[in-house]
Amino acid sequence: MMFWRKLPKALFIGLTLAIAVNLLLVFSSKGTLQNLFTGGLHRELPLHLNKRYGAVIKRLSHLEVELQDLKESMKLALRQQENVNSTLKRAKDEVRPLLKAMETKVNETKKHKTQMKLFPHSQLFRQWGEDLSEAQQKAAQDLFRKFGYNAYLSNQLPLNRTIPDTRDYRCLRKTYPSQLPSLSVILIFVNEALSIIQRAITSIINRTPSRLLKEIILVDDFSSNGELKVHLDEKIKLYNQKYPGLLKIIRHPERKGLAQARNTGWEAATADVVAILDAHIEVNVGWAEPILARIQEDRTVIVSPVFDNIRFDTFKLDKYELAVDGFNWELWCRYDALPQAWIDLHDVTAPVKSPSIMGILAANRHFLGEIGSLDGGMLIYGGENVELSLRVWQCGGKVEILPCSRIAHLERHHKPYALDLTAALKRNALRVAEIWMDEHKHMVYLAWNIPLQNSGIDFGDVSSRMALREKLKCKTFDWYLKNVYPLLKPLHTIVGYGRMKNLLDENVCLDQGPVPGNTPIMYYCHEFSSQNVYYHLTGELYVGQLIAEASASDRCLTDPGKAEKPTLEPCSKAAKNRLHIYWDFKPGGAVINRDTKRCLEMKKDLLGSHVLVLQTCSTQVWEIQHTVRDWGQTNSQ
């Protein structure tokens, strides 16, 4: 084997030719001699010649065999060489990707070793961003601060991405009339990421039958984001080249707030039905038909789809279960349990009557105008959906959730355009209370811990809205509570509320303490609801956020009887179990339990901090921030 590999190529070729020539001569000679010996002439040869030629023929035969063996050896050597070459090639082909993979792994290891987690405490990177370089992390975090969601990821996702169909399977069996009203979709935005708006538009176009979708109207409430100017205009032109006249954009010259932006879109709409949406949404399949069919059945109904949630960090969709939209006495929105009347229908596709709506709604365009559209006096954000819901219910319409219409809504981690919405929420809540809540409006003041008189909050001129209420001959808020939202329970026995201080140290206030937990504490005074206290003429002392609902209980200050420290117990349960929850109190006086006769007081612990105790009454007295009617002396601290 090694011998053949070492032969020079020219020598190898020459040797091969020589052997071939010799073989030809041998065979030729052998043939001649054989012919002479056994040929057709059959001549007799002398004996010595006969022997001589026989020996030659024998030798030639041996030589032929040897040469044949040599030829076979050469063939075998060549085949072995080919096998070796083939094996080497195959080995190289197999090893090459392994070596490449090992090299890649080494590079990745080096890469990970050099990368740092630049923002270990950022909520953006809890479940996302493991493979980002440091430069990518910085870019993603900057966009997160700017928009309140993962705009970096949004910019990489397809605009026409697929999201899970979250409808109940029975919704897929429903059929709708072939003739349905036309639809105007209104998208409200301020300083959204461009890719978010584009994805909303794309989902609407792709998942709404073109015969139903008349227009998409974008309302920009004075964005400062540069890409929402020229770049957005260019995108709209591209959409309109493919779908002529479908998209329109209206830009406010100044910030007007959510309610007025929705009114701007409504005023520009021309279809039979308007759907007013946030721009950070993706509509799901079959979202429009249930809306249009229901409004075609009843023009006085305001409807809302079911929300699903798009996570702010991963953009994954979380399915939300069907619920109705409610609110508390601060007019904060929330989800409430489904009404028993709907459950008894045994039809999961049926519309659900709801006390309120969230931020997305659809309505007959003319009916929405007849009842006054949205209250343009609501500023910035908050309460406008509750105001509309109260007006619709009290003025002859109804509000419903449609189980078979679903929209995915992108949650924000924070609202960068308004980091503190408290002032706007308070102001808007008082405006709603003054217009629509009649003798129960005080509950909003109590919940927000605002003085009933001289609140110092300007909620705007409400005369035109009061005139509208009179014109529409609207029902009372008491009717609404009894017939639509019996969950809310107004209270009329509260005579003192707000922060409560012991005059030993007016820098600390009574506080509900850690949650979960039921131990009240003394803590540095602040304006959050954990320090709200509500004293009733009947003797209860609520501590913490005011609930005043049928399905949940406020927490009452309780004397446990033997222990030194007071507790907070659910009022309804405590009353049922005859716990010591009733107190005598007047502003500037002691707080005395009616049963145990012990006083609520405070003392310093070993660390010098004030702690609450129940003990024999000394000279300690308490003040409460606000009083109602003629109870005690009016205070405002």
Swiss-Prot record:
Top-level taxonomic group: Eukaryota
Function: Probably catalyzes the initial reaction in O-linked oligosaccharide biosynthesis, the transfer of an N-acetyl-D-galactosamine residue to a serine or threonine residue on the protein receptor.
TM annotation in the entry: 7-29
Pathway(s) per entry: Protein modification; protein glycosylation
Name of the gene this protein is made from: GALNT8
Region of interest (Catalytic subdomain A), ranges: 180-294
SS bonds (residue pairs): C171-C404, C395-C474, C509-C525, C556-C571, C599-C617
Cofactor: Mn(2+)
Origin species: Homo sapiens
Region ranges (Catalytic subdomain B): 351-412
Domain notes: There are two conserved domains in the glycosyltransferase region: the N-terminal domain (domain A, also called GT1 motif), which is probably involved in manganese coordination and substrate binding and the C-terminal domain (domain B, also called Gal/GalNAc-T motif), which is probably involved in catalytic reaction and UDP-Gal binding. The ricin B-type lectin domain binds to GalNAc and contributes to the glycopeptide specificity.
Positions in the Cytoplasmic compartment: 1-6
Protein's UniProt name: Probable polypeptide N-acetylgalactosaminyltransferase 8
Gene Ontology biological-process entries: O-glycan processing; protein O-linked glycosylation
Keyword presence, Glycosyltransferase: yes
